A protein has these predicted regions:
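Short, charged, intrinsically disordered terminal tails
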Residues: 1, 220-228
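Generic N-terminal amphipathic, Lys/Arg-enriched alpha-helix
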Residues: 1-15
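Translation machinery proteins
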Residues: 20-81, 108
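Residue-level signature of catalytic and energy-coupling elements of molecular machines
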Residues: 25, 83, 128, 210
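Flexible, glycine/charged-enriched surface loops at secondary-structure junctions
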Residues: 37-41, 195-207
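Short flexible coil/turn linkers enriched for glycine and charged/polar residues
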Residues: 51, 65-67, 77, 162-165, ...
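Flexible glycine-/small-residue-rich
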Residues: 75, 171-173, 212-214, 222-224
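Long, charge-patterned amphipathic alpha-helical coiled-coil/hairpin "stalk" segments used as oligomerization
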Residues: 89-193
């Protein structure tokens, strides 16, 4: 992959093979960001997982960095008021299902009550492709709409390792203080560690790196991230 002049100049600010403490790594990432837009800070974690294993959950980040998301709630009439008062942008049942079935996806997150999943599950061709399908594993299939929407508005995000055991997640913006992004990463790593499969032998967290949208990756020390 070819990189531009600014990328190469910024890459000289650090040693690619070095491993840095978290806040120091994030300070470097911030100093190497050069795009005219507010670059996202990305976290990459390589986990010791078998192909049959996965790590997936949600976490509320202490410092939100994205605008408020539009939440759609599939529920029956008796739960509509709760969803609306909790701040859902769209609430409904069969009417919304038909609208989504037609290809409409002008929302960021979909939540459904369990009694709606029989019908919502038929929207896989639309919601599944966009990663919007409600799922019990991510807490988006629930009767507790009030607390679920409150967490989503606070910045709850989903993390999931891919088939090669690598977890990628946006954790902040370069305009944020490195300490704030560090707190977001610590929250993520705490939850990742809790999801460690019981039969994993050796180190669970193998490598951690951070980067900005347009910048190089910086290795992060993990000696304190993998203790039992």
């Amino acid at each position: 992959m070819k990189h531009g002049k600014k990328f190469k100049e910024n890459a000289k600010k650090y040693t690619p093979t070095n491993v840095y403490e978290l806040t120091e790594a994030l300070t470097l990432v911030k100093s190497m960001a050069y795009a005219k837009f507010d670059e996202t800070v990305d976290l990459s974690v390589k986990l010791n997982l078998k192909k049959s294993q996965t790590v997936r959950d949600t976490v509320v980040l202490p410092h939100q960095f994205r605008g408020e998301k539009k939440v759609l709630v599939f529920c029956k009439p008796e739960k509509e008021k709760e969803a609306q008062e909790a701040g859902a942008a769209f609430v409904g049942a069969d009417d919304l299902i038909e609208k989504v079935k037609g290809g409409w996806t002008d929302f960021d997150i979909a939540v459904a009550t369990p009694d709606m999943m029989k019908d919502v599950g038929k929207l896989g061709m639309v919601l599944g492709r966009k990663g919007l399908m409600p799922n019990p594993k991510t807490g988006t299939v629930t009767f507790d709409l009030k607390s679920t929407l409150a967490e989503l508005k606070k910045g709850r995000v989903e993390f999931r390792a891919d088939k090669s055991g690598v977890l990628h997640l946006a954790v902040g913006k370069v305009s944020m203080e490195p300490s704030q992004v560090a707190e977001n990463i610590t929250a993520v790593m705490t939850e990742v560690k809790r999801k460690r499969p019981v039969d994993v032998k050796g180190e669970f967290i193998q490598t951690v790196s951070v980067s900005s949208t347009m910048g190089p990756g910086v290795w992060v020390a993990i000696k304190d991230q993998d203790k039992e």
